[in-house]
Design a protein with these regions (language model features):
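Divalent metal-cofactor coordination and adjacent catalytic microenvironments
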Residues: 1-163
Length: 163
């Protein structure tokens, strides 16, 4: 079943100091780098690769707080980032808090909120993995390796074709 959200506004904020899912040591080992000359550059590449994977998958790899204002004619709302860790609040357009028993959260990685009546809602929740799945970690490492191998090229480099 397809859901058709209309997201009115959306913010995504890191909930704590960011600890990247791939360490500098892991990235250097994967890229076969033995010196520390490029450590700063590789650290930036790790962050960029993680952000690219998050955008490409719609998943939050590190803990974040999401605040979404949205509306939907069929009362089923696709949340823009998963997995959901906890629900902070669900508020209707009048500013009233909606009780936990009045909605259902379904799904894991790509959650949906089911609400029995149509209206605009503000949903605040925390999302992100506590342990990153290996396939996503490899995707980050592949992207870092690709970026590192192609650094300094004049052409526009994009997403690693391997993943």
């Amino acid at each position: 079943m397809a859901y058709s959200n209309f997201i009115i506004d959306f913010t995504l904020t890191d909930t704590a100091p960011v600890t990247e899912p791939v360490t500098l040591a892991e990235a250097k080992l994967y890229c076969r780098v033995t010196t520390s000359v490029d450590d700063n550059q590789i650290s930036l590449m790790i962050k960029q690769a993680r952000e690219a994977v998050e955008v490409g998958t719609g998943l939050s790899l590190i803990p974040k707080t999401a605040v979404v204002w949205f509306t939907n004619w069929n009362s089923a709302f696709e949340l823009p980032y998963g997995p959901v860790n906890s629900i902070t609040s669900l508020i209707n357009e009048q500013g009233d808090t909606i009780a936990v028993g009045d909605y259902t959260l379904i799904g894991g990685k790509f959650p949906k909120l089911i609400r029995p009546s149509y209206q605009n809602l503000k949903f605040t929740y925390t999302c992100g993995y506590t342990t990153i799945p290996n396939d996503l970690k490899i995707a980050i490492l592949d992207q870092v390796s690709y970026d590192y191998e192609n650094r300094g090229l004049d052409s526009n480099t994009g997403i690693c074709e391997k993943t």
